[in-house]
Amino acid sequence: LPVEVVAEFDTWRKIRDHEGAEGWVHQSMLSGRRTVIVTVAVRLLRSEPSESAAPMARLEPGVIGWLESCRGGWCEVEVAGIDGWLRRVDVWGVRADEAVED
């Protein structure tokens, strides 16, 4: 699951998930690769960062994808081996003002 690190102490990280639950984990339990989770109604994974782009997959709430990059209001993600674009507001795991480059 995607988590946000909200505090650090030595080798421990306090994390928060998309539902707001918090806890401490050892840093070795965390991956350096970012993930996001679809948090709203069914969304279409699109071929380009545009509402008019061809749909590549239909994603249900709770689907997790690998975060590749974000450009403006869109994020490029990989879900089950399919690369595509989702609107940033439709996922949890990346902040609205955060720059993400691949």
PLM features per residue range, with description:
Residues 2-58, 64-66, 70, 75-102:
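Boundary regions of SH3-family modules and the immediately adjacent low-complexity/disordered segments
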